[in-house]
């Protein structure tokens, strides 16, 4: 199990990313616009750097919904490999069965 503080930190990062999504997109559009003046582009870079670091979506880490485990995360299920295996063995995931050949 991950620490509760780590789970809370991830929730905070998701909230910040949602809050600043439009602002970040607007600034990135200005930065990538070749027709904008150099001064405007540079000011946009400075404003983007002044935003909270955790508002960047790349700072988020996929975590297991049940345990908070950050490694071996399966996006399809939103769980770690360990919890997917346990759920599959109990028959809780429809259509998923253990491989046998």
Swiss-Prot record:
GO terms for molecular function: rRNA binding; structural constituent of ribosome. It holds the Pfam family Ribosomal_S14. GO terms for cellular component: cytoplasm; small ribosomal subunit. Signal peptide: none annotated. The keyword RNA-binding applies. Coiled coil: none annotated. The keyword Phosphoprotein does not apply. Keywords: Ribonucleoprotein, Ribosomal protein, RNA-binding, rRNA-binding. GO terms for biological process: translation. It comes from the Bacteria. Belongs to the universal ribosomal protein uS14 family. PANTHER family: 30S RIBOSOMAL PROTEIN S14, SMALL RIBOSOMAL SUBUNIT PROTEIN US14M. Part of the 30S ribosomal subunit. Contacts proteins S3 and S10. Binds 16S rRNA, required for the assembly of 30S particles and may also be responsible for determining the conformation of the 16S rRNA at the A site. This is Small ribosomal subunit protein uS14. The gene is rpsN.
